[in-house]
Structure formats: structure tokens, C-alpha cells
């Protein structure tokens, strides 16, 4: 899938959920809310190309954590929001992958976690959360957000 087609599709979607005068934080929250409420989770996907993953999600309306991450990254990129992709470190050989983002609402000075993948039964909201919040959730849920912290900027403490 060529990036121009995917970008055009994202731009059309963004016209419905953000405005030019919105602050970066509001754009992040609007994108988060849209992705969480307009797509459904399916079990697996091809994880070789995030642009293709975003396109598949926008076309089919469903995907796994990689597709959620990919469509979110696409929307953030099109809004000019600095973001960094994060990949979970596997806790054991057959552990699953997981993908989410670190996002900055101040032009790249500080970052917060953003994970649009829905959670079954717990309703946790991972929109602009700190390392402490995400780590507490991860520790209580079998290391679901373990990551090599040396690869990513630390979030503010509060």
C-alpha cells in the first residue's frame, strides 16, 4: 500500500475528529477516543509494515494491538504529534508481542504512554499515562507492558 493513499485516508478521518485550533493534547485525546470507539479487536495481524497495518485497520474496522498502534501512529503523525513506537519485551519464549506509543504534547520535551488497544473486562484508560501508572498495570497483569526502558525516554513522575 502506498503511503500517499494511507495518508489521504487518515486526513479524511482526521477532518471528522480534530480541528486546526485544537491543542496537541486535545488532538491526542480525540485520536485516542476515535480509535478506541471505532475499531474492534481481532486476534492477529501481519506486523511487518506499520503503514499497511494502519490501512488494514481503517479498511476492515478491526485488528490486533499492532493495528491499533499503527493507526494511532498514523493519526498522530498526520497531526504533527511527536510519537515513538514501543514494543513489549517478551517475558517468556511463547509470550505475545504488544505495541503502543510514547507521545509528546509539548513538541518532544516530555513523553507519556498511549495504548489504544482495548482491554477485556477492565476498562483501563492508557491515554497519556506515566511510566508508574503503566508499570503498575503491567506488574499486575503478567508483564503485559514490559519494555527495555533504556530505549525510551522516561515519562514525568506525576
Give the location of each predicted region:
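Repeated polar recognition positions within modular binding domains
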Residues: 38, 42-45, 59, 96, ...
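Secondary-structure boundary elements
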Residues: 2-57
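Catalytic cysteine-centered active-site loop
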Residues: 42-55, 62, 80-95
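Short, well-ordered strand-loop elements centered on a beta-strand within folded domains, enriched
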Residues: 53-56, 60, 109-115
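Low-complexity, Gly/Ser/Thr/Pro-rich intrinsically disordered linker/tail segments
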Residues: 123-158
Amino acid at each position: 500500500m502506498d503511503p500517499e493513499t494511507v495518508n489521504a485516508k487518515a486526513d479524511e478521518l482526521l477532518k471528522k475528529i480534530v480541528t486546526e485550533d485544537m491543542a496537541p493534547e486535545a488532538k491526542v485525546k480525540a485520536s485516542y477516543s476515535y480509535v478506541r470507539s471505532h475499531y474492534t479487536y481481532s486476534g492477529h495481524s501481519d506486523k511487518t509494515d506499520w503503514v499497511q497495518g494502519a490501512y488494514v485497520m481503517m479498511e476492515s474496522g478491526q485488528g490486533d494491538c499492532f493495528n491499533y498502534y499503527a493507526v494511532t501512529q498514523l493519526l498522530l503523525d498526520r497531526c504533527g504529534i511527536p510519537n515513538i513506537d514501543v514494543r513489549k519485551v517478551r517475558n517468556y519464549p511463547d509470550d505475545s508481542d504488544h505495541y503502543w506509543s510514547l507521545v509528546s504534547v509539548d513538541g518532544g520535551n516530555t513523553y507519556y504512554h498511549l495504548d489504544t488497544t482495548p482491554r477485556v473486562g477492565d476498562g483501563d484508560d492508557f491515554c497519556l499515562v506515566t511510566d508508574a501508572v503503566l508499570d503498575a498495570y503491567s506488574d499486575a497483569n503478567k508483564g503485559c507492558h514490559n519494555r527495555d526502558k533504556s530505549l525510551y525516554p522516561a515519562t514525568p513522575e506525576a
